[in-house]
Amino acid sequence: TGGMSDVYAATDELLGRDVAVKMMRRDLARDTTFLERFRREAQNAAKLNHPAIVAVYDTGQTPDEDGAVPYIVMERVHGDTLRDIIQESGKMSLTDAASIMSQVCSALYFSHEAGIIHRDIKPANVMITNTGAVKVMDFGIARALSDSSSAMTQTAAVIGTAQ
């Protein structure tokens, strides 16, 4: 669950695989700024095919009498966020920290090479899978470098999540 959306575990019945479905909060689904940000997250993340970035499979909106709610279907990651691991275990070894950061940097380098800047990298947006793989997630406020219209970010606006 994030600021503008909720994430649910689901099954893609057609392909028989576990997925995560990120749904915009219903109260925000009528706000054009949030709709654009959500759409941009889906488009940006879908452009990125990297082992350390959560994959996006599909996007759409629910047919709803009370108004459509946008969603993103993505890879379901079994594991914990880096934030949760640090809170539960405290300090980690230099070797583990370096391995995690190396994979995060690889993912960010890949996204930057694709022209997409994450802009909210933090321990809560890094998952460590049950097998030890690293997955960067939540490109919700990412910006494509080619997007010269920074209409989504106003001058002097704060970007990211307050920690």
Question: For the regions a protein language model found, what residue spans apply to each?
Answer:
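Conserved N-lobe ATP-binding subsite of Hanks-type protein kinase domains
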Residues: 6
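Activation-segment/catalytic-loop signature of the eukaryotic protein kinase fold
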Residues: 59-62
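Activation segment signature within eukaryotic-like protein kinase domains
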Residues: 100-101
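Conserved short submotifs of the Hanks-type protein kinase catalytic core
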Residues: 66-81, 85
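Activation segment of protein kinases
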Residues: 30-33, 68, 129-163
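AlphaC helix of the eukaryotic protein kinase fold
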Residues: 25-47
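Protein kinase catalytic-loop region centered on the HRD/HxD motif
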Residues: 104-116
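Conserved N-lobe loop of protein kinases adjacent to the ATP-binding glycine-rich P-loop
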Residues: 11-18
